[in-house]
UniProtKB/Swiss-Prot annotation:
Pfam families per UniProt: Ribosomal_L14 (PF00238)
Stated family: Belongs to the universal ribosomal protein uL14 family.
The protein's name in its UniProt record: Large ribosomal subunit protein uL14
Gene that this sequence comes from: rplN
Role description: Binds to 23S rRNA. Forms part of two intersubunit bridges in the 70S ribosome.
GO molecular function: large ribosomal subunit rRNA binding; structural constituent of ribosome
Amino acid sequence: MIQVESRLEVADNTGAKSVLCIKVLGGSKRRYASVGDVIKVSIKEAAPRGRVKKGEIYSAVVVRTAKGIRRSDGSLVKFDGNAAVLLNAKLEPIGTRIFGPVTRELRTEKFMKIVSLAPEVL
């Protein structure tokens, strides 16, 4: 459950380490984002020779949340922290590697590239 001002770690190799959610996309009154939702983020911490710089604004898709995802069979998938993958204007991942597990809920046409790059799909 991500809202404005939430901090997330970055689960790709773009050089960003942590980001801050500045907008949840998908409606003017939308308050929370969950796994698979697109948000606007500001880079708060970045590696010196990374692809992105501190202060830049990007779109990102949420790949892990501490709140968890309830499945139709009744199971709940939770993670230790919140994580996102940075996207370009065409909603394609900027990085070429994904770190850590991602959930099966990302398996839509938009984010199949992220699922294929991920080391583990839960």
